[in-house]
Amino acid sequence: NEDLFQYNTKVSVPFVISNKNYGILWDSYSYCRWGNPEDYLQLNRAFKLYDKDGKEGQLTGTYVDKNGQKIVRGEDSIYFEYAMPEASEICNKTDNGGIQNLPKGFALNGSKVVYEGYVEAPTNSFYQFILYYAGYMKIYIDGKLVVPERWRTAWNPNSYKFETPIKKGVKTPIRIEWQPDGDVSYCGLRVAAPRSEAEKNQLSIWSEMSPDMDYYFIAGQNLDEVISGYRTLTGKASLYPKWTLGFWQSRERYQSSKDIEDNMKKFRDLHIPVDNIVQDWNYWKLDSWGSHEFEAARYPNPQAMLDSVHAMNGRFMISVWPKFYDTVKNYKELDSKGWMYHQAIKDDIHDWLGFRGSFYDAYSDGARKMFWRQMDENLYTKYKFGIDAWWMDASEPNVRDCTPMWYRKALSGPTALGTSTEYFNAYSIVNADAIYNGQRSVNPNQRVFLLTRSGFAGEQRYSTATWSGDIATRWEDMRAQMTAGLNYSMAG
């Protein structure tokens, strides 16, 4: 079972490939579910719950802060998966869930939380759970450690699916151990309703909003022919520049042109092969996100920096977001045409640096052309085509972390094509279109290369590579990237 939506560390392409030499491309841009078309249930909707003393109705939640102060209360569900901006009128009117339902006044940082008791299942089954977590988590069911310790940073929680057998009519012990990460943290545990073997062996597809229920069946003699058919439908993959196959040097983050040049020279002095050095975010003035301008105090001569990198036989990639602070000139120019999303401004959302901004509407052809022109005037043509590649960060788009699905759609719409519900998953491809066709329009003899944090069917035609986002620094997350990368690469 899989939910198809875009988020930091999650890329969703509505294409499935079979070892029987066929593929199915689902023609929908919206949030989808593959496998089980029903959403996961809160624990009290799937099971009878009992507290740790055996009383029916709810689990026991025990919260102990770093000073040893304890709160014990009943929990009929474990669903603390999101936060809402305090100034948002629509949030305050329509959604009182998420971390607002944690104990009032309880300090999460340094605390330990345990949810425990018993679940009684309505039928014998292997139950599929989905865990949402930030901080350290362990789960025991029927006395067995079914989820060994996992960790995620609080600003970017993770989901983890697991399956375990539970017998009908038996009070089965459950224990969830959570050590939150930071002052604000998240956790949740839900479960899918059991399905028959026949249902499990069928492909069910659910789409939240599509004008038609269309899909393409792609047959072939082998998997290569299936991928070829997929590319016939969605676009041929562009040829990357040769240097992209070499080693890239990136970090969070180089903070000056001197940093860039010194590190590139050090690699050369040590005879360590490197083909590409990457400038991550915040090369602009602190309050000027979206200006696409190097801060002069730290980057006094960007052209000389680029020339130096090229003289050392290196390439230069730079991060550009579809995000703009509402005080910068580029925001105002886009906004004057109606090409900025306004909900984040209306709700007075400030980012982690303390400034307010939003994302542009890449579904508008005019907005895409203006977005590229702003990049070109401030970065590309301005520096004699010296930028070799573009890192398109947050291209889901991820306007704000850790919000519920309905509010994410409110933040990223309405689009020029229609409601963000219908076009929820396709932002990265139209954003890639802006840069690919923009660069080709001013410099058709140079190959384009884009690194993007999100992807969709057809992304390959814009010479994109996709990375899996801000994963955790844990071995289990590193291992997951291997299968995730193989899985993603099967989509053309």
Where are the model-predicted features located?
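Aromatic-lined ligand-binding clefts that engage carbohydrates, nucleic acids, or primary amines
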Residues: 119-139, 174
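Catalytic-domain carbohydrate-binding cleft regions of carbohydrate-active enzymes
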Residues: 1-60, 65-94, 98-115, 136, ...
